[in-house]
């Protein structure tokens, strides 16, 4: 069955859809989950690792948008069985056999405790690759049989670090995101036709999240202002809602002709390194 060319009367709407957003308890994931609910998603699962209070707070906001069912699932992207376990719990908790939208947002970035590239160990390398590439791929594989007959959406949150030179402690993180970009493109080529689904990544630039704040601690001065001036054409750093709006577009019928893409979400990236020098 080819990707539909039928014109929708409300291509922006996600009314009645079911979605899973990993890492949806805070930051970008939280903003994505809330935005999907506002666009009409009916059933929504978010994941968290340890902070149940943040997950419950996110669900409270999501339910204010009129969602029918919202659940939080504890899931660790360093767990080898995260894909199988998460999707099984989501299907049961949401009382559904279909997941229309999968957003892989959860990621591992710990520049304070990650060794620089010249000191990287196999353990460090494997941990980042497992969290940022294997985990989302395994979640996609577990979700694949439960995508709808047409119009499924798989959206992976990546980073500009996958495409730029990076400071020493972020090199392996960038490599793990580049691997995810590659997997996403290949999945679009391999499965888009049979699944009539789209597979895209959103390459996020500097955005004010917990991870961004952690990175900022490594550098002196007014880091965020320097990033805004040196990294982006806009005079500010991104906020989670900036990313959520792009994901909402890709998840809707409006984004149906984008497949295998890495969508830049960076406010007009200038240079990768000047703010860090």
UniProtKB/Swiss-Prot annotation:
Q: Which UniProt keywords apply?
A: NADP, Oxidoreductase
**Catalytic residue positions:** 158 (proton donor), 159 (proton donor), 173 (proton acceptor), 177 (lowers pka of active site tyr)
Protein name as catalogued: Short chain dehydrogenase penD
The EC code for this enzyme is 1.1.1.-
Pathway where this protein functions: Secondary metabolite biosynthesis; Alkaloid biosynthesis; Mycotoxin biosynthesis
The coding gene here is: penD
Q: What family is reported?
A: Belongs to the short-chain dehydrogenases/reductases (SDR) family.
Superkingdom of the source species: Eukaryota
Main role? Short chain dehydrogenase; part of the gene cluster that mediates the biosynthesis of penigequinolones, potent insecticidal alkaloids that contain a highly modified 10-carbon prenyl group. The first stage is catalyzed by the nonribosomal peptide synthetase penN that condenses anthranilic acid and O-methyl-L-tyrosine to produce 4'-methoxycyclopeptin. 4'-methoxycyclopeptin is then converted to 4'-methoxydehydrocyclopeptin by the ketoglutarate-dependent dioxygenase penM through dehydrogenation to form a double bond between C-alpha and C-beta of the O-methyltyrosine side chain.
Asked if the record carries the keyword NADP, the reply is yes
GO MF annotation terms: oxidoreductase activity, acting on CH-OH group of donors
What chemistry does it catalyse, as a reaction equation?
yaequinolone D + NADPH + H(+) = penigequinolone A + NADP(+) + H2O; yaequinolone D + NADPH + H(+) = penigequinolone B + NADP(+) + H2O
Q: What SUPFAM superfamilies has UniProt attached to this entry?
A: NAD(P)-binding Rossmann-fold domains
Determine if Oxidoreductase is one of this entry's keywords. Answer: yes
Q: Which residues cross the membrane?
A: none
């Amino acid at each position: 069955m080819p990707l539909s060319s039928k014109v929708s009367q409300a291509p922006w709407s996600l009314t009645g859809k079911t979605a899973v957003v990993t890492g949806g308890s805070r930051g970008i994931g939280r903003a994505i989950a809330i935005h999907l609910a506002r666009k009409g998603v009916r059933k929504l699962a978010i994941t968290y690792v340890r902070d149940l209070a943040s997950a419950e707070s996110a669900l409270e906001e999501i339910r204010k948008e009129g969602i029918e069912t919202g659940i939080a699932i504890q899931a660790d992207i360093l767990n080898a069985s995260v894909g199988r376990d998460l999707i099984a719990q989501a299907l049961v908790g949401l009382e559904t056999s279909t997941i229309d939208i999968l957003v892989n947002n959860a990621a591992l970035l710990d520049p304070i405790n990650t060794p620089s590239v010249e000191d990287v160990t196999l353990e460090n390398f494997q941990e980042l690759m497992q969290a940022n590439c294997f985990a989302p791929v395994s979640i996609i594989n577990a979700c694949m049989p439960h995508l709808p007959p047409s119009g499924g959406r798989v959206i992976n949150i990546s980073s500009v670090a996958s495409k730029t030179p990076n400071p020493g402690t972020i090199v392996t993180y960038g490599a793990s995101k580049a691997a995810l970009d590659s997997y996403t493109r290949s999945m679009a080529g391999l499965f888009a036709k049979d699944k009539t689904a789209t597979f895209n990544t959103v390459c996020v630039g500097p955005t004010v999240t917990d991870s961004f704040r952690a990175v900022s601690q490594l550098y002196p001065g007014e880091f965020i202002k320097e990033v805004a001036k040196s990294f982006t054409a806009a005079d500010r750093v991104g906020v989670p809602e900036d990313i959520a709006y792009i994901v909402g577009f890709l998840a809707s019928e409006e984004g149906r002709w984008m497949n295998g893409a890495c969508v830049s979400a960076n406010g007009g990236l200038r240079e990768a390194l000047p703010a860090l020098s």
